[in-house]
Amino acid sequence: MSVAGLKKQFYKASQLVSEKVGGAEGTKLDDDFREMEKKVDITSKAVAEVLVRTIEYLQPNPASRAKLTMLNTVSKIRGQVKNPGYPQSEGLLGECMVRHGKELGGESNFGDALLDAGESMKRLAEVKDSLDIEVKQNFIDPLQNLCDKDLKEIQHHLKKLEGRRLDFDYKKKRQGKIPDEELRQALEKFEESKEVAETSMHNLLETDIEQVSQLSALVDAQLDYHRQAVQILEELADKLKRRVREASSRPRREFKPRPQEPFELGELEQPNGGFPCASAPKITASSSFRSGDKPTRTPSKSMPPLDQPSCKALYDFEPENDGELGFREGDLITLTNQIDENWYEGMLHGQSGFFPLSYVQVLVPLPQ
C-alpha cells in the first residue's frame, strides 16, 4: 500500500474512533437515502431467509440434505457428472410397498394393493423431483443471483461510501491544516459514492416486480405439482376401491387344516408352529437417518491387530447411493480418507467407497 493509501486509512480509523468513543458528529445522509438503505437491508434479509426456508420446504430432512451435500462434494472430487438426487419420502414409501407387495405375491389382495399404492407413490416422487427442478430454476437460482450480484454490489457501494465519508469528515474537521484541494477532492469522492449507492438501491427497489414474477413461478410450480399429485391419488383411490369390490364379491375359500404327521415320542419336542410378527418401528419426527444414531450392537468377532489405518464394522451397512461402501458386521475395512466429521472413505474386498463413521470402530486411525 502506498503512503497516500496508508494516510487515508489512518484518517478513516481516526475519524471512526472519534465518532464511536468521543461522540463526534459525522456527515448525515438525507432521510430519503436512509429510507432506501433500510428497505434494501430488509429485502436482503427477506431474500436470504426465504431461500433457506424454500430449500427446507423442498427437502425437509436435514440429515438427508447434509448427506446429499456430502455426496455431491465426493462426486465433484471424483469427477462424476451425475449427482444423486434428494431421497423423496414418497419414493422411499413406494419402494417399501412394492417390495413387500412382491413378497406377498399375486394371490394376496393386500399384496396387489401394495403394488398399486407403491407404484403411485413412486410416481409422486417423480413429480416431486420435477417440482424441485422447476422451483430451483425459476425461483431459487434467480433469488440466489440477486443475493450474489445485486445485493452484494450495493453492499460494496455502501461500504465504499462509508469509507469516503470518514475520510471527508476527518479532513473537514482539520480544515486549514489540510490543503483546500485535498478537502475538495474528498468531498467530490464522497458525493460520487453517494450517488452511485443511491442509484443502485433505487434500481433494485424499482425493479422488485422481478421478485414478484419469481414468486409467481414458485406458486405455479406448486399448483402444477398438486394437480398431478391429486390425479395420481385419485387414480390410486379408484383402483383400491375396485379391488375392495372385487374381493368382496368373491366367495371365501374354506380352510381345511391338514392332519399332523405322526411322530415318535423319542423325537425332540418342537415348539408350536407360527410366524413372528415384527413390531412396527416407532415413528418420530426425527426418525430419518442421522449420522449420530447407532443401531443396537450385536457381538462381533475379534480381529487381529493391524499396522495400517483401518476400522472394524460394528453393524451391517447397506449402501443406498452410488459411491457408498457396503459391509457386514465384523468386516475389516482399510481407511483411505476422512470425508468429514461423519463419513470415512475406505476399501473392502477391492472395492472403494464411503460409509458413516458411527457404523465402525477405528482400530488404527488415519495419520494427522
From Swiss-Prot:
Compartments where located: Cytoplasm; Early endosome membrane; Cell projection, Podosome
Basic and acidic residues bias: start-end ranges: 245-261
Source species, domain of life: Eukaryota
BAR domain residues: 18-249
Stretches for region Required for dimerization upon membrane association: 60-87
Cited CDD domains: BAR_Endophilin_A, SH3_Endophilin_A
Principal place of residence: cytoplasm
Annotated SUPFAM superfamilies: BAR/IMD domain-like, SH3-domain
Coiled-coil features, chain-numbered ranges: 180-250
Keywords: Cell junction, Cell projection, Coiled coil, Cytoplasm, Endocytosis, Endosome, Lipid-binding, Membrane, Phosphoprotein, SH3 domain
Modified residues (Phosphotyrosine): Y315
Membrane topology: Peripheral membrane protein
Molecular function GO labels: beta-1 adrenergic receptor binding; GTPase binding; identical protein binding; lipid binding; phosphatase binding; SH3 domain binding; transmembrane transporter binding
Record region (Interaction with ARC): 218-254
Domain notes: An N-terminal amphipathic helix, the BAR domain and a second amphipathic helix inserted into helix 1 of the BAR domain (N-BAR domain) induce membrane curvature and bind curved membranes.
Function: Implicated in endocytosis. May recruit other proteins to membranes with high curvature.
Self-association and partners: Interacts with ARC, SYNJ1 and DNM1. Interacts with PDCD6IP. Interacts with BIN2.
Family of this protein: Belongs to the endophilin family.
The protein's name: Endophilin-A2
Biological source species: Rattus norvegicus
Gene name per UniProt: Sh3gl1
